[in-house]
Amino acid sequence: MARKKLSMQQQLLEKMKEQNCLVDAYLRNREGVLVSRDKDSVPYTAQIWFEGRECDTRSENDILKSIRTLAQIHKIMQLPVEMDYAGRNLQEEYIRHNQEMKKIRRFIRKKGAVNSFEKDYLKSVEWFLQKAAAMLETTDYKNLRQQSLQSGSICHGEYNQHNVLILGKNTAVTNFSHWSFDVQMADLYRFMRKILEKYSWDLHIAQKMLSAYDSVRPLSESEWQNLRVRFCYPEKYWKLANHYYTHNKAVISGKNVEKLRT
């Protein structure tokens, strides 16, 4: 990690510690710096660690505790913005994904659809492209992103069950190395999506997670809209198509065909 980003990460973690958040802040060496070197001049860092267990995704209590913790740290995670560390523009990313899906459609049409995956893709891609375009037209993402950057809002970037440690009544959060200045709904979406995939997209648990987050950090109308767009965008569909195109196009597993159909 670049020293400047590491320094900013430590600044963020120290700010969070001051607000009684349990986070894996770095430890400075005798010279007061974050990066040390061993006898072979290999750089390393040392961090606070916690004796706890990972969030158990089979436990509703753990899930909701993790969601409330995310909402709590989001209220604190702000620094003066550095555009070098801004997250990717979601609208630009969706436009690029749409272009890639169109490219894959052209490729299959040109060579001819032979297997089940290719035939199903040609049957369904137009609907997904139209859905994706409609999502982009209705979103207020541009203004929400601008507001988030102006306020210096920061995303964890890798908030999942592996980086949430349950310590009895308390919760620690680790591995902030993927942090960025961004719309914080990105964290909430990624965590919820991972959980919902394990729960067969159970709306009941989805509502509980949203309520838990909103009870700690109330969501604005733009943030609700942004979450809706993220969940409605055919991200999984794009990933399957992109995997097909970038890997061996002649070999498509039955599992991927089934995923495309569902």
Each model region followed by its residue ranges:
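ATP-binding pocket architecture of kinase catalytic cores
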Residues: M1-M83
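ATP-dependent phospho-/nucleotidyl transfer catalytic cores
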Residues: R3-K4, C55, D84-I154, K259
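Active-site acidic catalytic loop and adjacent metal/ATP-binding pocket
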Residues: Y26, L136-A186
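Charge-rich, low-complexity terminal tails
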Residues: A250-T262
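Helix N-cap / loop-to-helix initiation motif
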Residues: L22, L219-E223
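Active-site activation/catalytic loop segments of kinase-like enzymes and analogous catalytic loops
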Residues: M185-P218, F231-A250
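A glycine-centered beta->alpha junction motif in the catalytic cores
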Residues: Y44-T57, L79, K103-K111, Y233-V251
